[in-house]
Amino acid sequence: MTRWRLDIAYDGANFSGWATQPDRRTVQGELETWIPRVLRLDQPTPLTVAGRTDAGVHARGQVAHVDLPDNVDTSAMLRRLSRVLTPDVVVKSVRPVPSTFDARFSALWRRYVYRLWDESSRPDPVTRFHVAPVRGHLDLDRLNTAGTSLLGLRDFAAFCKHREGATTIRTLLDCHAKRLDDPCGTVEVTVRADAFCHSMVRSLVGALTAVASGRRSQDWLDNVAASTSRASSVLVMPACGLTLEEVGYPSDEDLAQRAAQARSRRSHNDICDTCWEDR
């Protein structure tokens, strides 16, 4: 058997997220149904994914891995999948990778982009299912200052839906916004981190837009970010505006080390140790 990397794109509007669910249409469910069929395999082909996107969230740069026979004809596989999959999901490429590659745990970072229209924008009905409206005008200088204040290793519990046994400690690597020079004046908020917990990106954007529109202050955001439990005052933005754009990985020789590091559960001691090292 050989490990294969799949690069995948999908429009999440008509999917109940990535992960397989009973009686629900999901991206994982579609792919795990059709991959063994087009390869004429009599055993299941479970996929491991970089980011388990929620219902309605899109992806241009999703990555998964799967173990398949050594002699897979990737050209034929892609051609057959394009015939049987619906147009809202595409497997863009398939290539062999080292056995140490893990789409989830080997990832160094995930980059999401959230697209918004504010009162300065000119909405386009054709793309409305991929952009979320927000009330008022967004001051991007305020938004970028607020985003910068959240960078680094910290507990993002205030921005995450609770999951029993799951850590909410993450390293936020980049968080900035820009207004595109497009006919709509779309605002793009880029958020990149080593990993994300449930609803974290949409909650971060909800908090940042509250500050950028003047409805909330920077002090409010600072107090929210310091909380170790879910903040009810933070709006979770609609899924339609969010797209997983890219996943970054180390060189092949560092894959196993990165996977082992990612599997280790982080605690508040890690945050304290980092603060001490920065002095």
From Swiss-Prot:
The keyword Transmembrane helix does not apply. It catalyses: uridine(38/39/40) in tRNA = pseudouridine(38/39/40) in tRNA. Its EC number is 5.4.99.12. SUPFAM superfamilies: Pseudouridine synthase. Keywords: Isomerase, tRNA processing. The active site is at residue 54. GO terms for biological process: tRNA pseudouridine synthesis. The keyword Transferase does not apply. Gene3D superfamilies: Pseudouridine synthase I, catalytic domain, C-terminal subdomain (3.30.70.660), Pseudouridine synthase I, catalytic domain, N-terminal subdomain (3.30.70.580). Substrate binds at residue 112. GO terms for molecular function: RNA binding; tRNA pseudouridine(38-40) synthase activity. It comes from the Bacteria. Homodimer. Belongs to the tRNA pseudouridine synthase TruA family. Formation of pseudouridine at positions 38, 39 and 40 in the anticodon stem and loop of transfer RNAs. This is tRNA pseudouridine synthase A. The gene is truA.
